[in-house]
Amino acid sequence: RFLYMPGIIDSPDAKNFYYKELKRFVNELESLFGKRITDDDLREAIQIYDENRSMIMKIFHDRKNDRPIISGKEAYLITLSSMLTDKQDHNKLLKELLQKLPDREPLKQGVSRVMLVGSPMDNMKLLELIEDDIGAWVVTDDTCTGTRYTWGETPSTYLEKDPLRAI
């Protein structure tokens, strides 16, 4: 079965629908694997994911500088690797990267600064065209596989009493 997510996510009805979907999903996982998922398990996972998003946002923030030290292609690969790698392992890698980035040389001067807007990107061809062929910098984006992936921490208002609602 699928985990359904409403198209409009800001309304109270959509939030309640999604909460019920998450509860159903947790119940199915518990039944399938014979292991209870506790509130503490959820809180720990939320903390790990929030830490991951926070570190990615720090890296992405550098792209706005006059001379960024990370390219749009590299930013895309960081996000993609976050989607495909165990979050605890990815957090370790991000911590190492954050320690090394200040020593990195800024990118060579680009011809233009570009904001990429669109839907999820499933490959890097557009980024390669912009950065390698044209010589511009993709300094920010508004895509699901870019900055939107890191938007917002989990609301702490629900975290203590109902971590599933916080998700």
PLM features: residue spans?
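Short, charged, surface-exposed secondary-structure boundary motifs
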Residues: 10-14, 147-154
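Acidic, Ser/Thr-rich peripheral helices and adjacent loops at domain boundaries
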Residues: 155-167
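Gly/lys/ser-thr-rich phosphate-binding loops in alpha/beta enzymes
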Residues: 1-28
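A charged, amphipathic alpha-helical module
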Residues: 19, 23, 27-152
